[in-house]
Amino acid sequence: MSTNDLPGQVALITGGGRGIGASIARELAAAGASVAVAARTREQVEEVARQIDGLAVEVDVTDREAVERMVTEVERELGPIDLLAANAGVGSVSGSLWESDPHEWWHVFEVNVLGVYLCCRAVLPRMLERGSGRIVITGSGGGYLPGSTNTAYSASKAAVNRLGETLAESLRQTPVRVFVFSPGLVQTEMTGDLSDDAPWTPPELAPHLVHVLASGRADELAGRYLHAEHDDIEDLIGRADEIQRSDLNSIRLRR
């Protein structure tokens, strides 16, 4: 992708302090966007923001008022938000459901599902009023292909996948577009030891399908967010349901 593809665009990335979110932030900045990097850990977002000359915002995405303040701050400092990447998520709480801690289990839902809801809820009225905007939600292949242990993560991502798909459908007649990006196993800090099994494959092309990066690394996946910004890909996205290399390396991009 060439540089300066998104001059004048303002992007807000939640969960932007590390992993996929940090890679998205760097890619968007390289394309010329003004980027706000948001996460709970200030040190992490400040470091990423420093690297890309962006805006660092400390936020708890489960706190409605904090999310509203975040959006207000970003638009005050950078201008109207053109792209929201709702990427914040957690993946802890493993083991059997019957041995899990209910508070820890629910925390996964609060971050992964409520966080996406609150962020979308905060930016959508502004986007609709302006008549433009893109929202990209990070789901997970785990929401379609459940694992045997982490029920909280799989169940929460199933909810995120459907939340995004339903939101996209409800906004189909508006100028605002919503995309759900659901990778398979990804080599990030969140996946921990599982990263050893995360696939590393080249992009796969298929007739009438969006060609997406099927790699499992955060830096490779980041480009998909940029591609979703461009109108010339929308016809393909509308015809693309799924590109799947294997059960553990599936990427769904739904509009």
Regions found by a protein language model. Give the residues of each.
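Catalytic Tyr-X3-Lys loop
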Residues: 98-117, 132, 136, 160
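Conserved mid-core segment of classical short-chain dehydrogenase/reductases
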Residues: 68, 91-106, 149-152
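The beta1-alpha1 cofactor-binding region of Rossmann-like NAD(H)/NADP(H)-dependent oxidoreductases
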Residues: 59-70, 102
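Active-site-adjacent segment of SDR/Rossmann-fold oxidoreductases
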Residues: 145, 154, 166-176, 217-219
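Active-site helix of classical SDR
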Residues: 120, 156
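C-terminal helical subdomain
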Residues: 180-181, 196-255
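Conserved glycine-rich cofactor-binding loop
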Residues: 17-18
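Residue(s) in the substrate-gating loop at a strand-loop-helix junction
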Residues: 140
